[in-house]
């Protein structure tokens, strides 16, 4: 649960914690098969831990951002995955 999100950058996958990040030796699609159910894909390049989301902000342009408890980090949510994330959060209540 200490991992806030996974993200790809330069063909590498990184796991982000509250104040650091480290490289992971899996592809995102491989991670989706092995991480707990409360993680959710939010873009082609990111998977988020839904248990640590503090807020979701949606702008007029349609882009969205997730913020986390106890961290200044934020992550972009693509329009395509926004509803999937919202449904996942409702399901977990």
Give, region by region, the residue ranges found by the protein language model.
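Intrinsically disordered, low-complexity N-terminal regions enriched in serine/proline/glycine
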Residues: 38, 80-81
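Charged phosphate-binding loop/patch that engages nucleotide di/tri-phosphates or the phosphate backbone
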Residues: 84-93
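C-terminal structural segments of small proteins and small subunits
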Residues: 72, 76-77, 83-84
